[in-house]
Amino acid sequence: MARYVYKFGGTSVADARRLYAAARKLAAAQRQGNEVIGVLSARAGQTDALLALAREVDPDCSGRELDALLSTGEQCSIALCAMALR
């Protein structure tokens, strides 16, 4: 069994159509008997939007809180991809 890692950038998961396309690639590779790992970025523009909001709240934002906030973009993409795979 081969192991494949698929990386999808923000544009690749920017909307439902593209997200389904990414999910189909993951599912197809797995159906062929491969071990599949999906790595997903936040949707296009989402990280910038979160960063802008954080800077409105705290112009000097940094550290742990900012890291936690920005990671929600990836978590959103992961959850949506899991839904698309069902």
Language-model segments: what does each one mean?
Residues 1-86:
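Nucleotide/pyrophosphate-binding catalytic subdomain
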